[in-house]
Amino acid sequence: MASLPILAITSGEPAGIGPELCAQLSRRDWPLRPVVLGDFELIRARAAGAAVVRAYMPDAPAAAGVLDVLHVPLNVAARPGRLDPANAGYVLALLDRAVHGCRSGEFGAIVTAPVHKGVINDAGVAFSGHTEYLAEHTGTPRVVMMLVGGGLRVALATTHLPLAAVPGAITPALLDETLRILHADLAGRFGLAAPRILVAGLNPHAGEGGHMGREEIDVIAPVLERLRGEGMRLVGPLPADTLFVPHTLGQGDAVLAMYHDQGLPVLKHASFGGGVNVTLGLPIIRTSVDHGTALDLAGTGRADPGSLFAAVELATAMVCNRDVAR
């Protein structure tokens, strides 16, 4: 019988809550085996006796209450709540090892605990986030950020841009590529054979027939019409204020929002801290928590693992859907 896929869980910033969140994975039995990538002694210390921490062996069976750790050594000792640029290389080494394992077939997916972008940049490494790093290191020219939680799937046409820059970034080429990636991953990794995507407009009231902006008429609608002609089930452009009501949301499988704060506040309100960040378009599956390093909680034992658990659950479902689709 073939062994089940392994999920690589990167433990993230060592001064943050990532290591202790990862230690809590031993509290549950998982359909696929989670393996934590991190410094062995760091993870064991943050587990604080709540789990049996053992060295990762590829062929060892999963065991209740046991946490498998693939040892990646810290550069310098880590203290809860105290960032040290000397460990930036360690954080990136976790990601590199996880990507290598996914590309080689050792791992079925990556689940990432939070990193601290600022301290990585302080170390002299230009780093804008997991998403961009993974795209670069897998040779992926375009990826799409989607948040999942509270019964919603919300993808973004643009991500971390100033609001003033968003209209110029919403081009036919960007929307075409974004919708193709979203559609492909909903079908191949979410098990939705013919996904229905609700597309938000950019302007209030979706432009009010051109009286409040013409992006809907000149850019968004023509792209949707062309892709409908290829068989995609697309609804929109819809006014965002009425799109995010239960009746409308119930008519679609996912939402494409035009910018970060158009879509994510609704999802984060609905998910109650259990949201999951998914990177679409990669050749590998990657999910992540939807929160930061929470340095003030590190080492206190009070960090909530809900988002990490949800990220592991979603990665598991995506692996299973992908394998069925193959």
Curated annotation (Swiss-Prot):
Disulfide bond entries: none
Gene Ontology, cellular component aspect: cytoplasm
Give, as one word, the top-level EC class: oxidoreductase
The record's section on Gene3D superfamilies has: Isopropylmalate Dehydrogenase (3.40.718.10)
A Pfam family of the record is PdxA
Record keywords = Cobalt, Cytoplasm, Magnesium, Metal-binding, NAD, NADP, Oxidoreductase, Pyridoxine biosynthesis, Zinc
What EC numbers are recorded for this enzyme?
1.1.1.262
| Assembly behavior | Homodimer.
The entry sums up its family as follows:
Belongs to the PdxA family.
Annotated protein name in UniProt: 4-hydroxythreonine-4-phosphate dehydrogenase
- Origin organism is Aromatoleum aromaticum (strain DSM 19018 / LMG 30748 / EbN1)
